């Protein structure tokens, strides 16, 4: 029953890569039961969702170019701390874990260019995090452009203290143990009411985290 969908949610491919194929909606279209509104203000209908799901099932966004699974995910509530830094979407923390040790992390902030998604390949901001203190350091816009401030503001990206930092690291390590992968990137968001929540696990977490931290994984 399409009408049973909540006012806000995310639709994702199971084996997607680089944020491709993800749709995030922020509320129902006023006076319509068959449509929702996305971050950029555009409208998406039930027919649009059906078409997108067919594309996901056909493997259009699959990293292996094979038939995939589509799933709906609840949209979390934004933590007040991140409100000035994030454009509409929910930030998350990507933690790289290798052999049960968290070795690198970054805060990912959605932007207007990324359509409210915390994905650097689509134009989000990545901010390196000091592993000992959970405090942000250097930042990158997209995949390679080093920045100091939130675009078009004087809001510094360094010096943000990540709440629940030790809990986030523990969750990331536990996720790696359960997955039985020796190396992965755990994406963890902080819900306003529930605290840290796992969004997804990535067997190929990308290279941008090294740029954001101005450091290579090999040295860790």
Question: Positions of the model-derived regions?
Answer:
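Phosphate-binding site of ATP-dependent enzymes
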Residues: 37-141
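Intrinsically disordered, low-complexity Ser/Thr/Pro/Gly-rich regulatory segments
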Residues: 127-157, 168, 172-175
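C-terminal active-site "lid" helix and adjoining low-complexity regulatory extension at the edge
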Residues: 149-167, 177-181, 190-220
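Glycine-rich phosphate-binding loop of ATP-grasp-fold ATP-dependent ligases
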Residues: 10-53
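Short amphipathic alpha-helix with an adjacent loop that forms part of the alpha/beta core around
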Residues: 1-4
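A short, polar/proline- and glycine-enriched secondary-structure boundary/capping micro-motif
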Residues: 22, 113-122, 208-213
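Short, surface-exposed charged micro-motifs
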Residues: 94, 187-189
């Amino acid at each position: 029953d399409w009408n049973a969908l909540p006012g806000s949610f995310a639709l994702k491919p199971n084996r997607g890569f680089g944020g491709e194929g993800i749709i995030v909606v922020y509320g129902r279209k006023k006076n319509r039961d068959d449509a929702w509104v996305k971050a950029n203000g555009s409208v998406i209908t039930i027919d649009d969702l059906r078409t997108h799901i067919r594309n996901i099932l056909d493997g259009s966004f699959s990293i292996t170019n094979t038939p995939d699974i589509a799933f709906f995910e609840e949209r979390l509530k934004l933590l007040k701390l991140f409100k000035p830094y994030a454009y509409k979407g929910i930030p998350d923390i990507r933690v790289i874990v290798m052999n049960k040790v968290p070795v690198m992390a970054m805060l990912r902030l959605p932007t207007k260019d990324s359509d409210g998604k915390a994905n650097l390949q689509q134009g989000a901001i990545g901010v390196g995090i000091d592993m000992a203190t959970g405090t942000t350091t250097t930042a990158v816009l997209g995949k390679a452009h080093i920045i100091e401030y939130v675009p078009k503001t004087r809001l510094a990206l360094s010096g943000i203290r990540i709440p629940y930092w030790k809990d986030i690291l523990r969750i990331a390590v536990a996720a790696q143990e359960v997955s039985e992968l020796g190396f992965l990137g755990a994406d963890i968001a902080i819900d306003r009411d529930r605290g840290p929540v796992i969004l997804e696990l990535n067997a190929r977490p990308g290279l941008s985290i090294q740029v954001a931290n101005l450091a290579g994984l090999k040295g860790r």
